[in-house]
Amino acid sequence: MPFLQISLLSIGVAADAFACSVVRGTAIQVNLFKRALVLAGIFGVFQAAMPLIGWFIGRFFAGITFIAEIDHWIAFALLGIVGTKMIWDAFQPEDDETIVDDGRVQFRPAIILGLATSIDALAVGMGLAFVEVSILKVALSMGSITFALSLAGAWIGHHGGGKFGKWATILGGIILIGIGANIVYEHLSA
């Protein structure tokens, strides 16, 4: 998988974490850098670990002969489902949850959000088990891009940019669907 495709895939799966960081950033009133760094670190670690876990699960099933014949369709379906769900979720009404800022780093909510926003990376990792790719490069790219975008998202949210999260999620969904379609196209044109 080329570098550009890995980068786009990483941006696509990082969109949910970016959106959550923007929302969390709107509530941060003190200790912005420290709290944004912790949030971005947690999101980055989850986004790096989950595709590895998914890849190992996918590789377990990749050896089954009939799956090898349809592997490109599996990758397309997983990426398409995750991308479509991201777009769908972006148009759903938001909860009117008010986040109270007590000035402390809140690890538990960050870990829950990190897990929730990385489920798509798990599915992507499963799909990538069926194509030729260096999963370590993908995992490092996903983790580092998620870290950077989450850090930026918290800063943007803190400075009044709460509306960016929705559009980032939509763009991320479109990117994932496009990469899935490209996998099928490359297989069918080979």
Swiss-Prot record:
**Could you tell me which InterPro entries the record lists for this protein?**
Mntp/YtaF, Put_MntP
- Give the keywords, sorted: Cell membrane, Ion transport, Manganese, Membrane, Transmembrane, Transmembrane helix, Transport
Drop me one GO molecular function for this one: manganese ion transmembrane transporter activity
**Keyword Transport part of the UniProt annotation:** yes
Keyword Phosphoprotein set for record: no
The principal localisation class reads membrane
Membrane topology per the entry is: Multi-pass membrane protein
Q: Subcellular location, in the record's words?
A: Cell membrane
Q: Name one Pfam family in it.
A: Mntp
From which residue to which does the signal peptide run?
none
| Top-level taxon of origin | Bacteria
Transmembrane ranges, per UniProt, are: 3-23, 37-57, 72-88, 111-131, 138-158, 164-184
A single GO CC term for this protein reads:
plasma membrane
Q: Which family does it belong to?
A: Belongs to the MntP (TC 9.B.29) family.
Question: What HAMAP family would the database entry show?
Answer: MntP_pump (MF_01521)
Q: What does this protein's UniProt record list under function? A: Probably functions as a manganese efflux pump.
Q: Know the name of this protein?
A: Putative manganese efflux pump MntP
